């Protein structure tokens, strides 16, 4: 994969499609948190299917500059989109690529599922896949306790992940407001035709009930899985690629 930076801050891996088509189709991958960036095999899978793929790191996470959650993570992705169409220069050898997407899709899981849903509000985005997404940060206390015994979750992240996440207590607490980076707050704005969710009923970290409630409130489609736990986005995308591709195609104009 190639590497570039958008807005001089946001480190992004990218791949061109294995075979170029008449139209440029772009998929943006949105990571969970905390996680280790490891969606490169998924990016290769999608590039082999004919898609451009970009895999950004949120500001303040991993190789990107800035402070994590200083602004809503989905806005980091919008900042990337604001530089497209355009030429991107890969860092290692300076080769330039022209990315001019005719269609843009998003695939995000867990924490990144919230980004996917919020990105669906942007008219440039045709369709999004949200796997085991956080739909409402009212689950935060429960989710924190499932991951650590420490009372201060941001402190746990700093200790366990070091500088991988430059996360302050104040920025983490913004999630508790119900306003910041919260799909539930925007449920009345969601176009149900643009969102497809996957969620396992036995997910121990992000409760299935949140996706079911979001489905009822918005009319988005939810693919419910009996088992699987906090299932990986790589697995979901590969296993259900036929359904996902059909869903993407339904958004063509």
Locations of regions flagged by a protein language model:
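Alpha/beta-hydrolase active-site loop
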Residues: 68-98
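Conserved alpha/beta-hydrolase "acid-adjacent" motif
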Residues: 204-210
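N-terminal cap/lid segment of alpha/beta-hydrolase-fold proteins
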Residues: 1-22
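Short beta-strand/loop motif that positions the catalytic acidic residue
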Residues: 190-191, 196-199, 203
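Short beta-strand element of the alpha/beta-hydrolase
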Residues: 23-32
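Conserved alpha/beta-hydrolase
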Residues: 47-65
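Catalytic histidine-centered segment of alpha/beta-hydrolase-like enzymes
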Residues: 228-241
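Hydrolase active-site cap/lid region
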Residues: 118, 122-168
């Amino acid at each position: 994969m190639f590497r570039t930076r958008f807005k001089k801050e946001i480190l992004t891996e990218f791949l061109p499609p294995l075979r170029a088509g008449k139209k440029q189709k772009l998929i943006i991958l949105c990571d969970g948190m905390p996680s280790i960036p490891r969606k490169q095999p998924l990016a290769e899978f999608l590039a082999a299917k004919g898609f451009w793929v970009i895999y950004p790191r949120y500001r303040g996470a991993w190789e990107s500059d800035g402070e994590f959650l200083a602004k809503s993570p989905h806005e980091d992705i919008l900042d990337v989109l604001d530089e497209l169409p355009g030429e991107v220069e890969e860092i290692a050898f300076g080769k330039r690529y022209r990315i001019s997407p005719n269609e843009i899709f998003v695939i995000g899981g867990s924490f990144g599922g919230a980004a996917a849903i919020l990105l669906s509000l942007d008219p440039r985005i045709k369709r999004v896949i949200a796997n085991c997404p956080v739909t409402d940060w009212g689950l935060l206390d429960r989710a924190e306790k499932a991951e650590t015994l420490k009372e201060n979750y941001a402190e746990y992240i700093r200790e366990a992940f070091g500088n991988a996440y430059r996360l302050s207590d104040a920025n983490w607490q913004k999630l508790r407001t119900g306003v910041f980076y919260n799909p539930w707050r925007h449920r009345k704005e969601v176009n149900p035709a643009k969102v497809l969710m996957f969620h396992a009923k036995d997910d121990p970290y992000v409760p299935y009930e949140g996706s079911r409630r979001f489905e009822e409130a918005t009319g988005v489609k939810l693919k419910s899985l009996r088992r699987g736990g906090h299932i990986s986005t790589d697995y979901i995308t590969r296993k259900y690629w036929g359904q996902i591709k059909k869903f993407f195609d339904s958004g063509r104009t």
